[in-house]
Structures are given as structure tokens and as C-alpha cells.
């Protein structure tokens, strides 16, 4: 969606078709969270959609587009079918590494060779809150009947799993208490799913930070809190400096004030580093000046990484670049919904 169009992709494809005519094949790669509309399907020759969340198959999805485009250019006709689910799936329940999404994606044909049906699933993006928000299945085949059969088969399988999409979330206090009671040797990861900037959140709410301090969490770190003003104050003081900070809560959201705390500046960074996880491996991050702060004058042991730009904490390098080894922490709190799993799950006992 855009500020002026509820169906931005449909509008874009419609304008392209006006220029190219109906004969030109157009194969489109889409995000797993796409909200697919009939208008989009009517103007595109085919869709290829990410099949992993975390999205570690972005390049592979582009590669899957090519053989389908070749088929269309060779003269093969692919008939489209689309089915929409009757329910919404929260982003936190769209993880493809576990049931029920794992089983649904196993239903998709893996071969895009000539003559083979092509199917994909989009899980939708509920926060968009548009008419067509929600999961959908697209299928393309040599006949309309075959395309309809594939789309119907997959959407019916999805409908049977509606109650399996777990939307239950812990309160911040409960999550901290559970993490503190854990006795394993590896960290507990707490995902602050309601404040994920990758889904449009402000990344500056402080409820989880307060819960960590009030819950007397030990050896805990939270990342990444968006607060340019606090970063600037820390940069001016320098490492080792102590100051009274009003952390986060500056986005203007109702009932989302700053967290007042006395902080020590542990480390500073220009925020430029290389991502190391599979999702963005090799890409250079430029998240602006950052400051690692320690909450002092409390019975807890909590540090918080504060940034001057919003960045979903989906890669361990966000922490390691400033000297924090998340694998050595007891609790790692991340402002992310699912993307963090690819890089953080291997070091964790519990999420």
C-alpha cells in the first residue's frame, strides 16, 4: 500500500500493462508478507514469493522467477488462480521453521520446469489493515482447471490449520520472569515483537526495558532502542561518562513515555559494520551513531544498545560490532518479530 493507493502493487502493474500491452510476460517476486489482490494477479504473468521467514531465500526467489519467465517467453501459457484465506495470521505466527507454516510450505511444488504447475503462498501483512490483507495462494498451470485445483488444495490445507497459528504472547514481566528462572547454559532470547521497526514500529517503546530492570534481570542486553538524542548525549560525554537519560519514548505515541535512568556509557560506535547472518550476510550496515549504555543505581545488570536510526535487531553483528557477544549473555532482548531467529536461534537455549 502507499499513501494514495491501498493496492500499490496492483496500481503499479496496471500502469506497466498500459505501456506494454497484455502480451509481454511480467514475472514478479514478492515478499512473504505480501497482501495479494485480484488486480495484481490480473496484471502479472506470475508471482514468485519468498518461502522463508526469516527471509533467507531472497536471492533464490529471484532465481525462481527466471525459468518461469523463460517458459512464458517460449510461448507456454500459464493460467492463474488465486485463493484468499478467511482469517489473518499475526506476524509472530508466520515463522516458516515450525508448524503450521512448515507443513504448508512443504505442499508447494519444487519444480518449475516446463509443463509443471507453479504455486506459492503469501502469508499477508495484517498491520496494513486493507481490504485484501491476509494469506493467499497463487497457482499457475497449463489449464485453468489445474490451476484452480492446486490453489484450492493448498488454501483448504491452510484453512484446516487456522487454530494452529499461535498468537499467544507473554507480557514483558512474564517473559523476564521466565528468562530469569531458566537454568540452561545458553542465553534466553526475548523478542519484543510489538516494537519491531521492520514492521513499521517506532523501536522506542520502553516496556520491556522497564521489565528487565524491575525484574532484577542479570547479564541482560536490549537492542536496538531508537533514541538519537540520548546517543548524542552519550557521544558528547564519551566512554565511561555517567548521565541521567530519558531513554526512548520520544515518538509521541500515547502512554509510551521515556524510561528515566542513570546510565554509564560503555561503548560508542559510528554504526557501520558488516552483517554476518544469512539474511544480509556481507551487506554493510549503516545505522548511524550508536551507544551501549549500562543502567546504574539498580539491582539489575542491564545494558541497552541505543541507536540514532531504526534498525531491526536481526543480526548478531548489531551487538558484536560494539563489543557485546550475545552468546555470553543470560538474556538478549531484541526488537524483532521473527527475522532474529536465523542468527540468534543457534546461540539460544530458549526463545
List each model region and its residues.
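Active-site histidine-anchored catalytic micro-motif
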Residues: 1-73, 187, 192-209, 213, ...
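Short acidic, glycine/serine/threonine-rich loops at helix termini
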Residues: 4-7, 37-42, 59-61, 92-99, ...
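Short alpha-helical segments and helix-capping/turn motifs at coil-helix boundaries
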Residues: 11, 207, 288-289, 315-320
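Short, structured patches in soluble enzyme cores that scaffold and shape functional sites
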Residues: 30, 51-52, 84-89, 139-141, ...
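C-terminal functional extensions of proteins
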Residues: 66, 73, 78, 345, ...
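Internal, active-site/partner-interface "lid" segment
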Residues: 73-101
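Hard-cation-handling environments
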Residues: 92-301, 305-309
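Catalytic centers of hydrolytic enzymes
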Residues: 298-351
Amino acid at each position: 500500500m502507499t499513501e494514495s493507493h491501498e493496492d500499490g502493487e496492483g496500481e503499479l502493474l496496471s500502469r506497466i500493462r498500459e505501456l506494454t500491452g497484455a502480451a509481454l510476460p511480467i514475472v514478479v517476486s514478492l515478499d512473504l508478507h505480501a497482501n495479494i489482490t485480484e488486480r495484481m494477479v490480473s496484471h502479472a504473468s506470475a508471482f514468485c514469493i519468498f518461502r522463508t521467514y526469516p527471509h533467507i531465500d531472497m536471492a533464490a526467489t529471484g532465481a525462481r522467477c527466471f525459468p518461469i519467465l523463460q517458459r512464458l517467453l517460449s510461448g507456454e501459457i500459464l493460467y492463474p488462480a488465486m485463493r484468499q484465506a478467511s482469517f489473518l495470521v499475526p506476524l509472530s505466527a508466520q515463522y516458516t521453521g515450525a508448524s503450521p507454516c512448515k507443513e504448508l510450505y512443504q505442499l508447494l511444488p519444487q519444480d518449475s520446469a516446463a509443463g509443471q504447475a507453479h504455486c506459492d503462498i503469501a502469508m499477508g501483512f495484517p498491520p496494513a489493515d486493507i481490504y485484501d490483507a491476509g494469506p493467499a495462494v497463487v497457482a499457475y498451470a497449463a489449464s485453468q482447471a489445474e490451476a484452480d485445483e492446486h490453489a484450492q488444495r493448498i488454501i483448504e490445507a491452510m484453512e484446516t490449520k487456522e487454530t494452529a497459528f499461535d498468537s499467544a504472547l507473554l507480557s514483558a514481566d512474564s517473559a523476564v520472569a521466565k528468562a530469569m528462572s531458566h537454568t540452561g547454559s545458553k542465553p534466553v532470547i526475548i523478542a519484543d515483537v510489538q516494537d519491531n521497526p521492520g514492521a513499521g514500529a517506532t523501536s522506542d517503546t520502553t516496556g520491556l526495558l522497564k521489565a528487565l530492570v524491575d525484574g532484577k534481570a542479570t547479564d541482560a542486553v536490549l537492542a536496538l532502542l531508537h533514541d538519537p538524542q540520548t546517543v548524542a548525549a552519550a557521544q558528547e560525554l564519551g566512554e565511561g561518562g555517567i548521565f541521567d537519560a530519558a531513554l526512548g519514548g520520544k515518538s509521541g505515541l500515547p502512554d509510551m513515555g521515556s524510561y528515566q535512568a542513570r546510565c554509564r556509557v560503555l561503548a560508542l560506535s559510528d554504526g557501520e559494520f558488516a552483517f554476518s547472518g544469512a539474511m544480509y550476510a556481507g551487506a554493510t550496515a549503516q545505522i548511524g551513531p550508536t551507544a551501549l549504555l549500562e543502567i546504574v543505581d539498580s539491582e539489575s545488570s542491564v545494558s541497552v544498545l541505543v541507536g540514532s536510526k531504526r534498525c531491526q535487531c536481526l543480526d548478531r553483528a548489531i551487538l558484536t560490532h560494539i563489543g557485546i557477544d550475545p552468546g555470553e549473555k543470560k538474556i538478549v532482548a531484541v526488537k524483532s518479530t521473527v527475522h532474529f531467529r536465523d542468527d540468534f536461534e543457534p546461540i539460544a537455549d530458549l526463545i
